[in-house]
């Protein structure tokens, strides 16, 4: 059975809830999800995460205790690896430190050094919401939409440069994510209300469509193998 691994921040946990519910997942493919809330590119250390068996956050809506929680050691270097990091960096840190190039360079280095046998697919970070929603709870500093868009562009420009230099050519673009959910930008009315305070997490209907996009892209790569 072909393996697809999807790792990233809390948005991976959210889309994972729709695995098995969508119509594009064939029985010959096994998808493993590892998503960690607030996981930034800057704090990625795949070797350490593997050795310490760092646990994922699990699903936001758990059907049972520990639903979706797995150690990072379950992520093997033997299939298609989709990486969906960078949202946290763009939202919270890059406007403050203005080090998008360094962050992107470290990201690619971590991938290349730790996943030599995988087919790599880099998913561009979830596009920023027009409002910095977490500011309402004091969870994060507040940066304007334009500030975050500027840092997003810097990060993506550097990310593609270093990926190209490393021979990584498979990407899922922010424009494809927006097309999948049928909008030009992400707005507060698209967020779910499952938490007691506003969160920058999309409603189920959008996460389901995003997962469909990821699976379809992965299946295209699997077809190229056969």
Region roles according to the model:
Residues 132-175, 195-208:
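Substrate-gating cap/lid alpha-helix
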Residues 1-53, 73-74, 81:
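Serine-esterase "nucleophile elbow" of acetyl-processing enzymes
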Residues 2-5, 29, 78-82, 118-123, ...:
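Hydrophobic beta-strand segments of well-ordered beta-sheets in folded domains
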């Amino acid at each position: 059975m072909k393996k697809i691994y999807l790792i990233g921040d809390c948005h991976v946990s959210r889309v994972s809830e729709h695995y098995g519910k969508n119509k594009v997942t064939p029985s010959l493919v096994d998808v493993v999800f590892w998503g960690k809330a607030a996981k930034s590119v800057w704090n990625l250390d795949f070797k350490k995460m593997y050795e310490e068996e760092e646990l994922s956050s699990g699903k936001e809506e758990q059907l049972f205790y520990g639903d979706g929680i797995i150690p990072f050691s379950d992520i093997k270097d033997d299939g298609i690896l989709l990486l969906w990091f960078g949202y946290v960096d763009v939202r919270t840190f890059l406007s403050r430190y203005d080090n998008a190039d360094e962050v992107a360079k470290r990201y690619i280095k971590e991938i290349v050094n730790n996943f030599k046998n995988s087919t790599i697919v880099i998913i561009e970070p979830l596009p920023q919401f027009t409002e910095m929603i977490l500011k309402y709870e004091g969870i994060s500093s507040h940066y304007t939409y334009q500030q975050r868009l500027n840092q997003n562009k810097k990060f993506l420009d550097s990310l593609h440069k270093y990926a190209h230099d490393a021979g990584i050519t498979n990407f899922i673009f922010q424009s494809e994510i927006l097309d999948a959910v049928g909008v030009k930008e992400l707005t507060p009315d698209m967020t779910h209300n499952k938490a007691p305070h506003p969160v920058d997490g999309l409603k189920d209907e959008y996460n389901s469509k995003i997962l469909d996009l990821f699976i379809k892209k992965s299946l295209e790569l699997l077809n190229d193998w056969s």
